[in-house]
A protein has these predicted regions:
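Metal-dependent catalytic neighborhoods of phosphoester/phosphodiester hydrolases
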Residues: 113-123
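Short glycine-/acidic-enriched loop or helix-start segments at secondary-structure transitions
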Residues: 20, 71-72, 114-115, 144-145
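Metallo-beta-lactamase
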Residues: 1-95, 99-111, 127-154
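Catalytic metal-binding/acid-base residues of hydrolase active sites
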Residues: 67, 109, 139
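Surface-exposed, flexible loop/turn segments at secondary-structure boundaries
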Residues: 16, 111, 141
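Active-site flanking residues adjacent to catalytic metal/cofactor-binding acidic residues
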Residues: 62, 106, 135-136
Length: 154
């Protein structure tokens, strides 16, 4: 989609599953389960989308999905599904990791910043080596010191 000198692409990094009750909180299950049917473990399907923006010679990526650094236990818990993954979707649009100028994370939950890094020789290194990463200061502080209630999201 184009809007003036802005070009937008919605990229999908697949889906994962989370507990429906945790997602909908005080909304009764009979209400939310009509629009988001849970599986046998009470998990609902959640999509992971990123937004690629090109403007003024800059390439901006908003959110980076869940990434690929998951152990078997968490793969089972979250039931990640879907192809192609974010790197392949970027490549299909002619974008290499080193072409990304800015990565914006609205917050740092695992399903929003997973591709911020990739593993090289057992170490996490920036996936987008030339990018400036942008996140709210308070969110960064909270991610480093999460509460008991939300520590699993980081």
């Amino acid at each position: 989609m184009k809007l003036g000198d802005l070009e937008f692409h919605i990229l999908n990094d697949g889906t994962f599953r989370l507990d429906g009750g945790a997602m909908f909180g005080v909304i009764p299950r009979p209400m939310w389960s009509r629009v988001a049917p849970p599986d046998e473990r009470n998990r609902i399907v959640m999509a992971m989308n990123s937004l690629l923006i090109r403007t003024g010679g800059k390439t901006i990526l908003v959110e980076t999905g869940a990434g690929d650094k998951w152990d078997d236990k968490r793969r089972d818990i979250y039931a990640f599904e879907g192809q192609p993954r974010l790197p392949e979707q970027l490549a299909a649009r002619g974008v290499r990791p080193e072409d990304v100028d800015i990565v914006v994370n609205t917050h740092l939950h695992f399903d929003h910043c997973g591709w911020n890094t990739r593993r090289v020789d057992g170490r996490a290194v920036p996936m987008f080596p030339n990018a400036r990463y942008v996140v709210q200061r308070r969110e960064l502080e909270h991610a480093h010191n999460p509460s008991e209630r939300d520590h699993a999201s980081y």
